[in-house]
């Protein structure tokens, strides 16, 4: 009786290699996402600080203008 090689062993090895590649890609993507998140967080913090500064200046001007017009 002749045995037939279906090549299943090779296919399993290929799938295993693909799984390893997928895990490596996920790790790379996760680190890229983490770096991007940190950069965006820094940008948002900077923007919020700038907004706070503008609001403080405008609040002082508003109060000065209100008092000059006779407001209490």
UniProtKB/Swiss-Prot annotation:
One Pfam entry name: Pup
User: Pathway membership of this protein?
Assistant: Protein degradation; proteasomal Pup-dependent pathway
Choose any GO biological process term that the UniProt entry carries and state it: protein pupylation
Gene Ontology MF: a single term:
protein tag activity
**Reported modifications of this chain:** Is modified by deamidation of its C-terminal glutamine to glutamate by the deamidase Dop, a prerequisite to the subsequent pupylation process.
* Keyword terms: Coiled coil, Isopeptide bond, Ubl conjugation pathway
**Isoglutamyl lysine isopeptide (Gln-Lys) (interchain with K-? in acceptor proteins) crosslink, residue number(s):** 72
Q: Which residues form a coiled coil?
A: 27-61
- Ranges of Gly residues compositional bias? 1-10
User: Region ARC ATPase binding: what ranges?
Assistant: 28-66
- Where are stretches of biased composition, namely Basic and acidic residues? 32-41
Residue numbers carrying Deamidated glutamine: 72
Ranges where the record places region Disordered: 1-41
Q: What does this protein do?
A: Protein modifier that is covalently attached to lysine residues of substrate proteins, thereby targeting them for proteasomal degradation. The tagging system is termed pupylation.
Domain comment, as recorded: The N-terminal unstructured half of Pup provides a signal required to initiate unfolding and degradation by the proteasome but is not needed for pupylation, while the C-terminal helical half of Pup interacts with ARC to target proteins to the proteasome.
Name the protein family: Belongs to the prokaryotic ubiquitin-like protein family.
Assembly and binders:
Strongly interacts with the proteasome-associated ATPase ARC through a hydrophobic interface; the interacting region of Pup lies in its C-terminal half. There is one Pup binding site per ARC hexamer ring.
Q: Which HAMAP family match?
A: Pup
The name on file for this protein is Prokaryotic ubiquitin-like protein Pup
> Upper lineage ranks?
Bacteria, Bacillati, Actinomycetota, Actinomycetes, Frankiales
């Amino acid at each position: 009786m002749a045995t037939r090689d279906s090549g299943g062993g090779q296919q399993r090895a290929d799938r295993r290699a693909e799984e390893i590649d997928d895990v490596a890609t996920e790790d790379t993507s996760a680190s890229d996402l983490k770096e991007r998140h940190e950069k965006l967080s820094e940008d948002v913090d900077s923007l919020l600080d700038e907004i706070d500064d503008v609001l403080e200046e405008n609040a002082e001007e508003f109060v000065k203008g209100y008092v000059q017009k006779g407001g209490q």
